[in-house]
């Protein structure tokens, strides 16, 4: 089990997503969204997220800021994944932990495949796709990666519930420390 704890967000936490995406630089936004979103486009994207249909996952730092996020959009028979990790936190496995949690959710939804679409030059996403042994097709500067999912079972459902409970406990501990003040 990874020591990176990934927690699912509720619709009430939508406001916490906006600072995360706004903290992405111009190039990072271009790689994450496929085009260089300005601040208004980022806000519109966050406002359009359908928490009833989709799943949003986050990794929090000790100050309770989102440092990594995954949006899993449920489609007809598949789920599409977008991942972002803030620059100072890359190379630590956050993207892989977010992808693993998204994989588990998509499997438990009963979809047949997890799909990622990105620019071919997005080395981080291409690396994640290869590590997850996704089937990658690159053409005209864009890449699509697919992972066929096995059916959900008791283990996958338990794994998801357990991961969420541990992440909620970790978040509560961090929140308690923030109430106590620095150095506690």
Which stretches of residues belong to each language-model region?
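Terminal substrate-recognition subdomain of acyl/acetyltransferases
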Residues: 2, 83-84, 117-118, 124-184
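A short beta-loop-alpha structural element at the N-terminal edge
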Residues: 4-16
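Conserved acetyl-CoA-binding loop-helix of GNAT-fold acetyltransferases
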Residues: 91-106, 113, 127-131
